Amino acid sequence: MADKLTDDQITEYRESFRLFDKNGDGSITKKELGTMMRSIGEKPTKADLQDLMNEADLDGDGTIDFPEFLCVMAKNQGHDQAPRHTKKTMADKLTDDQITEYRESFRLFDKNGDGSITKKELRTVMFSLGKNRTKADLQDMMNEVDLDGDGTIDFPEFLYLMAKNQGHDQAPRHTKKTMVDYQLTDDQILEFREAFRVFDKNGDGYITVNELRTTMRSLGETQTKAELQDMINEADADGDGTISFSEFVCVMTGKMIDTQSKKETYRVVNQGQGQVQRHTRNDRAGGTNWERDIAVGVASNIIASPISDFMKDRFKDLFEALLS
């Protein structure tokens, strides 16, 4: 059966197979099979993939090896729809720089480092790259590549989506720069995450008007709902009524200054005195108000304007300065 394939076809299939054989054991799962076939221009449905697996997976272990895959591909030659992208596969559409950028952004939001992201994380990754998508768009993207229905996609699947959707993106509303363009260090990202968590009370990855109000009140500030909504709107690039982590970072990095230090200290304006306190992460175990310090300290560190420009160390002034 394999003699029906040309040497070039076998080479292409072998390269794709190796790419998606994650653990290098010489076999792939149904989900990996679907991703691999799309990478070489095929468009199998879930039913098609199940039929292929049933046909090739002779021992019923849920995987197929390369010889089995070659037999399936040879047998099904001439029965597939013409690939949408002619001679080039999806991966060929991306430059090395694009792949590097996508890999960095993917890694940034792969929170547990398992090589996959959820739909919610996909939304954040897309925005960090300056690509705005509706919830319906994101669901369609997930449905297309999440063949096993586990609610996650891996990096090769993500690359496929990026290649397929090139040229269909709107410019980000905030700024021409995206989150990845700022080339933040791991320490800077950690600082942003800690500050973001102060606002994101329920930990769902978004700051709502109510969560913003709660945090502001804890800092001694009271605003009307309209004022709080204005603050949300300034940062809400995709118009969903909330601030995601990437939106939060994009706003704040717009006025970022270099504040890295070997001790990873946080500058905190001492209330009513205008003096600078320094708190390291070791203070977390002490008696300091860590949440307030990290919120104000991180913001203080990344504001381009001098601290003396602020009338108070209240976070209201700080936050409004960020959004101005």
Swiss-Prot record:
Entries under PROSITE patterns matching the protein: EF_HAND_1, EF_HAND_2
Q: Where does Ca(2+) 4 bind?
A: D146, D148, D150, T152, E157
User: MF terms per GO, please?
Assistant: calcium ion binding; mRNA binding
Give the record's GO CC terms.
Answer: cytosol; plant-type vacuole; plasmodesma
Provide the alphabetized UniProt keywords: Calcium, Metal-binding, Repeat
> Residues that bind Ca(2+) 2, according to the entry?
D57, D59, D61, T63, E68
**Entry binding sites for Ca(2+) 5:** D200, N202, D204, Y206, E211
Q: Which GO terms describe its biological process?
A: cellular response to hypoxia; response to absence of light; response to mechanical stimulus; thigmotropism
What sequence ranges are listed for the domain EF-hand?
8-43, 44-79, 97-132, 133-168, 187-222, 223-258
Q: Which residues bind Ca(2+) 3?
A: D110, N112, D114, S116, E121
Which residues bind Ca(2+) 6 per the record? D236, D238, D240, T242, E247
Q: Which SUPFAM superfamilies match?
A: EF-hand
Q: What does this protein do?
A: Potential calcium sensor that binds calcium in vitro.
The protein in question is named Calmodulin-like protein 12
The protein's organism comes out as Arabidopsis thaliana (Mouse-ear cress)
Q: Which gene encodes it?
A: CML12
